[in-house]
A protein has these predicted regions:
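Glycine-rich beta-strand-centered segment in the early N-terminal region that forms part
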Residues: 20-34, 48-95, 134-136
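NAD(P)H dinucleotide-binding glycine-rich loop of Rossmann-like/cofactor-binding domains
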Residues: 91-169
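C-terminal hydrophobic helical "lid"/dimerization subdomain
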Residues: 241, 245-249, 290-339
């Protein structure tokens, strides 16, 4: 079968590898769709992550497909089911798992980051990580359940109040998901800052009340222009250091700043502690998707969340190395690899 195999920084190869054998509690999935995530970009760029990605690993952790084989102990799905995958396999017995914060599991296995993932034609997955969905939902939509689950965890931590004001910095896929979730949480005003015009237009279509071009408009002035007196929640989804610093500056009194965008491990920001003290700002961060995957999938299936509009385009597996190597292409929008 064809697979995208990572070897080292800037070295991802499309190769023929054997179809994996499954154990008693695993399923074999014919992968149909796998999204390119920011984590994939960081791995390709050689950045250190939460766990090292071994040479020879097949990347891809946002994927869906069809079950073609099941182990004898599998009870949750059947051959022919359409499924998507939660890529974070927890051990269940470390202190973090037993303490109810399993996303910090000391023995976590990352499908597509530490073991083979979805950028391959066939993938073996433990039954505990597989979620069936109706065949009326496209494989591309279902592959978006993983990033939605991550966003749900972040929004849960923001404590967005009904009638409040939310500012989202960054209008890529994550920012556009956050925009919709903030609206569903009851925010009366959601502002979104994004330099690319097409993404601002899409943000307005998805419900943004205020859109801001940060290259040509002053963020604080634009908010004042729309009579925004206090921003209660700021969600930084761009992963840029300057955006995190700006989030702290524009945050209102007694507000929450969610640092959601992924930065490089060795990057630092300049923060004025007095500003945080004076405004009683709460700084928060969000790590992967503990216990939110089912909710994410249900929101996609119910149509409460539009995940199709933010897909920039689909591509073949053979195009993947070129997309990862092209920073301009990477920034254009969300890619889904079809297999």
């Amino acid at each position: 079968m064809k697979a995208a195999v990572f070897y080292r920084k800037n070295d991802l190869r499309i190769e023929e590898i054997p179809i994996p054998e499954i154990s008693a509690d695993e399923v074999l999935i014919k992968v149909h769709a796998c999204g390119i995530c920011g984590t994939d970009l960081h791995i390709f760029d050689g950045d250190e992550g939460a766990a090292p990605t071994p040479a020879g690993t097949v990347l891809g952790h946002e994927f869906s497909g069809e079950v073609i084989k099941i182990g004898e102990l599998v009870k949750t799905v059947s051959v022919g089911d359409a499924v998507c995958v939660d890529p974070n396999k927890l051990c269940g017995y470390c202190d973090y798992c037993r303490g109810g914060i399993g996303h910090f599991c000391e023995n976590i296995v990352g499908i597509g980051t530490t073991v083979n993932g979805g950028f391959e034609e066939y993938c073996r997955v433990p039954q505990s990580q597989v979620y069936p969905f109706p065949k009326s939902i496209s494989f591309e939509k279902a592959a978006m359940a993983e990033p939605v689950a991550c966003c749900l965890h972040g929004v849960d931590m923001c404590d967005i109040s009904c009638g409040g004001t939310v500012l989202i910095i960054g209008g890529g896929m994550i920012g556009l998901i956050m925009l919709q979730l903030a609206k569903l949480r009851g925010a009366s005003v959601v502002a979104l800052s994004e330099p690319i015009k097409e993404k601002r237009v899409l943000a307005e279509r998805l419900g943004a009340d205020i859109v801001i071009d940060p290259f040509n408009e002053d963020l604080a002035d634009k908010l004042k222009e729309h009579n925004v007196k206090r921003v209660g929640t700021v969600i930084e989804s761009a992963g840029r250091l300057s955006a995190i610093e700006q989030a702290i500056q524009v945050a209102g009194n007694k507000s929450t700043v969610m640092m959601f965008g992924l930065t490089k491990p060795d990057e630092t920001i300049t923060v004025k502690p007095f500003e945080i003290f004076k405004k009683e700002i709460t700084l928060k961060s969000s790590y992967i998707n503990p216990y939110t995957y089912r909710r994410a999938l249900d929101m996609i299936v119910s149509g409460k969340l539009d995940v199709s509009s933010m897909i920039y385009r689909t591509a073949d597996l053979e195009e993947l190395p070129g997309i990862l190597a092209d920073k301009k292409a990477r920034g254009a929008g969300k890619y889904i690899i079809k297999l």
